[in-house]
C-alpha cells in the first residue's frame, strides 16, 4: 500500500547563523534600530546585532572599533530562534555606554517604550524579557 502514496522529501537542514546581540544602554535607555523595509523581519525594531560570535573581549573590541564608548560590558543569556529556513543561535551582551553615539541610526527607548511603542520581533524575546524583568 505504501508504494501508492508519494514519499515526502526529507527536510534539508536549516541554515545556522551565529549572532551576537548587544543590549546597548545609555542613561537608563536602550538603543534600538529599525530593520530594513524588505527581507526577514522587515520594518520591525531590533537590538544591535552582528552575524558573528564573540567572546567578552572580542565583543568589547568590536564595539570600540565601531565608535561605541563602552563603560561596562557583561555577558548575557544565549538565545535561539527558529525560522522556517534559518536557525539563529545568539549570544548576548549587556553594554553600558559612556556616550550616546550621535548620527548612528539608533533610537533611545525606555523599558516602557520598548514594551508599548516599538515592535520587537519574537526572535529577540529572550533579550527583551531580560530588560523588562
Language-model regions: role of each:
Residues 1-133:
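Intrinsically disordered, low-complexity, charged terminal extensions of DNA damage-control enzymes
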